Amino acid sequence: MSRKQLALFEPTLVVQALKEAVKKLNPQAQWRNPVMFIVWIGSLLTTCISIAMASGAMPGNALFSAAISGWLWITVLFANFAEALAEGRSKAQANSLKGVKKTAFARKLREPKYGAVADKVPADQLRKGDIVLVEAGDIIPCDGEVIEGGASVDESAITGESAPVIRESGGDFASVTGGTRILSDWLVIECSVNPGETFLDRMIAMVEGAQRRKTPNEIALTILLIALTIVFLLATATLWPFSAWGGNAVSVTVLVALLVCLIPTTIGGLLSAIGVAGMSRMLGANVIATSGRAVEAAGDVDVLLLDKTGTITLGNRQASEFIPAQGVDEKTLADAAQLASLADETPEGRSIVILAKQRFNLRERDVQSLHATFVPFTAQSRMSGINIDNRMIRKGSVDAIRRHVEANGGHFPTDVDQKVDQVARQGATPLVVVEGSRVLGVIALKDIVKGGIKERFAQLRKMGIKTVMITGDNRLTAAAIAAEAGVDDFLAEATPEAKLALIRQYQAEGRLVAMTGDGTNDAPALAQADVAVAMNSGTQAAKEAGNMVDLDSNPTKLIEVVHIGKQMLMTRGSLTTFSIANDVAKYFAIIPAAFAATYPQLNALNIMCLHSPDSAILSAVIFNALIIVFLIPLALKGVSYKPLTASAMLRRNLWIYGLGGLLVPFIGIKVIDLLLTVCSLV
């Protein structure tokens, strides 16, 4: 389930972003972006020069200087607008979460049990460890763990999913989130956080970006941009004495225009917007990342640990075959298996009934009309079945049925052992059926591998990402399913300790590991993984250990998370390539215009045949500003993502954004120059 997507240029967001762009013109805000701070200083300097020229205090073309100054200010505003628009989209998404915080009062229990005396207190006064009672119609006032009761809970305000979920004490479904609503029954909840520390509070603060910290890659790129800016600043500063020595000193306005066009203003103006938009796209997929670092790490992941059930397989095993023991016909086995499953409401039990009906036209029979007694499955017996008159039919795991047969004085056939082993090798789970002490045969329960999953794993493999299936199945079954699904490796009979050891092993090899989890036993592995996506339906411990929370609680989402992370890194790299390639065309526009009077040989570089020095310089400055606006949609939506190898992706991006970065400015600057000339603006 995805949240409602905002239009790229929502009118209300655009208006608000324009206001914020003007507010960001203050020096304190500009200082955070060194590249744009240089442009801001240049704008201020050229404005002062324009005023001085207009008043007669300085010689020069005041109109040209004012035009350059105006477009430099527009460049700064466009960069501010890109960042403000990205932040505005994130804040708009956060407002949907803010609307959840409506509860005003809570019933705080004096004792941790249902029926204890309750005091009505403001919800924002609840502390960690307090016990509260919530009943049908109430909004849960805090994050916590259910310690008593069970209820249907509407979590649509947070997840966007309209179907209610069950929350109950014990197990992995005891965690509740403040702001969700109880639909039926009641819950006694122990608060797990203090005011201001709830899941909603943390998520709102993160989404709004108030505390957004730069990621390592973002910092590294910023350092590169600063270095390039310093190099171009020094180069530009040395040009003035050269031109002055030649007898025709270049004006400060032209030098500022040259500097601004040469430094990487395009990526400098869009860098913050790309980071904010990456987290916003993650929320659009109903995944909340606790930091931009987590989103970035998702783009660098090269090992995926995937749970078999629900991620690789559909999660519900289906009966696929009846394999009779020696001397037993298949219909007899199917009849007994169906009888043993008549009152079994599990998906596996229903599939056995359906398979018997399909194969042998065996109709369901009413357990009550048969005067039969149903024997439910228990963790101790690991069997279920039915007693009809003198018939005692059971189905269950191999070990459980073996003990049952031997306890009733029977013998477990060797040929059935072989059939069990054969079923396991094929990736299915064997269930053995017995009547009295006579083993009738084996039911093969097959895990259904999700359609298209093998192709997705093949795409991940092309990208250099290794997939590892995690399962509690035995090695034979795990190996068969792994082969069918097309994963690169598997961990069978997985325990929390084994998962943690596997993650550490891959990290010791220098790999970045991503995984999903929902239980308390997953918390150590989630805390160790580089990208850890906790299920919203999971325990509080799992959500605290992870650095992302999937509001849909869909383990398959991990693959989408990696795609979004890679798209953000690709967007940043592609726009950096485009920005630096841009400088070449601007060099051919401004250098001849600025210095041809001193060094006529430079006219050979005027390959665009621009109308005049003034029009050439102004055209380059205008293009430099407009390209930021044209690239805002790309920064917010991300570049087109295709699962390719690293080398193929590099070649593709160099062709599109490297060559494009060279050609687009030549065309753009020439078109602007023609328009300025036709309109007699220079």
UniProtKB/Swiss-Prot annotation:
GO molecular function, one term: ATP binding
Pfam short name (any one): Hydrolase
Presence of keyword ATP-binding: yes
CDD domains linked: P-type_ATPase_K
Keywords (A to Z) from UniProt: ATP-binding, Cell inner membrane, Cell membrane, Ion transport, Magnesium, Membrane, Metal-binding, Nucleotide-binding, Phosphoprotein, Potassium, Potassium transport, Translocase, Transmembrane, Transmembrane helix, Transport
Binding site for ATP: D344, E348, F377, T378, A379, Q380, S381, R382, M383, S384, K395
Membrane topology: Multi-pass membrane protein
Localization: Cell inner membrane
Taxonomic superkingdom: Bacteria
UniProt-listed InterPro entries: ATPase_P-typ_cyto_dom_N, ATPase_P-typ_P_site, ATPase_P-typ_TM_dom_sf, ATPase_P-typ_transduc_dom_A_sf, HAD-like_sf, HAD_sf, P-type_ATPase_bsu_IA, P_typ_ATPase
Record's catalysed reaction(s): K(+)(out) + ATP + H2O = K(+)(in) + ADP + phosphate + H(+)
Chain positions recorded as Mg(2+) binding sites: D518, D522
PANTHER family registered for this protein in UniProt: POTASSIUM-TRANSPORTING ATPASE ATP-BINDING SUBUNIT (PTHR43743:SF1)
Annotated family: Belongs to the cation transport ATPase (P-type) (TC 3.A.3) family. Type IA subfamily.
Main function: Part of the high-affinity ATP-driven potassium transport (or Kdp) system, which catalyzes the hydrolysis of ATP coupled with the electrogenic transport of potassium into the cytoplasm. This subunit is responsible for energy coupling to the transport system and for the release of the potassium ions to the cytoplasm.
Record protein name field: Potassium-transporting ATPase ATP-binding subunit
